[in-house]
Amino acid sequence: MTFDENISRILVTDKEYDMPFSKGLLARSLSAAGMKPSESYTLAREIERDLTEQNVLKISKDELRRRVYYTLINRDYEGIGEKYLLWRRVLKKHSIIILVGGSSGVGTSTIAFELASRLGIPSVIGTDSIREVMRRSISKDLVPMLYESSYTAWTALRRSQWEEQDTKGMHLLGFERHVEPVLLGIESIIDRSLTEGTSVIIEGTHIVPGLMGEKYQSMPNVIFLNLTLSSEEIHKKRFTARAKVSDRPLERYLENFEIIKEINQYIVEKSKENNVPVIENVSISETVQKCLEIVTERFSNLTDEPIDSDFY
């Protein structure tokens, strides 16, 4: 019998079903607890090897978790071990709604998908998609700002509103009017996820703390994160990279870059006013790690439920 054949016979048992042991699932659980992806996969492979050498063909999910926990402790990963147990208690017993906000080009999509992969959250929704749905429901005559980009929405304001604002104020007023109808769709998705007990990550420019309903700020399993980029050079490079893999014109972003900067600063200020973490997204790996730490800390008070999860 080959090594691979032996591994395929290891079953992880639960009350309702059995499933084959998976290094990928275990590595993802360890990664969510804060271990580096390369280290988490190495440890998962070692645990797989130990089970094989001990001729373990069936193991309960609880016993596997104990093995993983004590392996972490013995390797001086005590902090990760505690977080690992925390996530095992929380996942699948509480829906997780993570809102990743930030202006155009700061990297909300990339971070959202990385978090989804680490946490095993199957659904990532961009607010641009929600905006498209809202456009089908609201006519252009009623809310013309909705039919513009976040940084050109000011051009759809009435002339009388132009006269009441300075240039920056006009840009931000247009942005707010653009965001408001999209927030209705975002809040509807959050409400449905909470009702159905499903987890989701929503990302995009339209997530602005202080403009959303106050009730979401106090919910322990609705977590706001704001990304920013202080470096203009890095920010512009992100637009250049985006233009290479999509049909979004680089020139349009660069022409409106000063307005995008104003919107970025506005979102940062609103985040600080509402005690939402602001994360400098220069390094993807460091940003993901920081986000995981914030999410883990937020869930540290939700540990009274019995452990049950599709993760190991």
From Swiss-Prot:
Organism: Methanococcus maripaludis (strain C7 / ATCC BAA-1331)
HAMAP family with a match to the protein in the record: 2PGK
Lineage: Archaea, Methanobacteriati, Methanobacteriota, Methanomada group, Methanococci
Entries under InterPro entries matching the protein: 2PKG (IPR020872), ATP-cone_dom (IPR005144), P-loop_NTPase (IPR027417)
Pathway terms, separated by semicolons: Thermoadapter biosynthesis; cyclic 2,3-diphosphoglycerate biosynthesis; cyclic 2,3-diphosphoglycerate from 2-phospho-D-glycerate: step 1/2
Residues passing through the membrane, by range: none
Residue span(s) of domain ATP-cone: 8-95
Record's protein name: 2-phosphoglycerate kinase
Any Pfam family the entry gives: ATP-cone
Task performed by this protein: Catalyzes the phosphorylation of 2-phosphoglycerate to 2,3-diphosphoglycerate. Involved in the biosynthesis of cyclic 2,3-bisphosphoglycerate, a thermoprotectant.
Catalysed reactions listed for this entry: (2R)-2-phosphoglycerate + ATP = (2R)-2,3-bisphosphoglycerate + ADP + H(+)
An example Gene Ontology molecular-function term: phosphotransferase activity, carboxyl group as acceptor
Needed cofactors: a divalent metal cation
Keywords assigned: ATP-binding, Kinase, Nucleotide-binding, Transferase
Family membership noted in the UniProt record: Belongs to the 2-phosphoglycerate kinase family.
E.C. numbers: 2.7.2.16
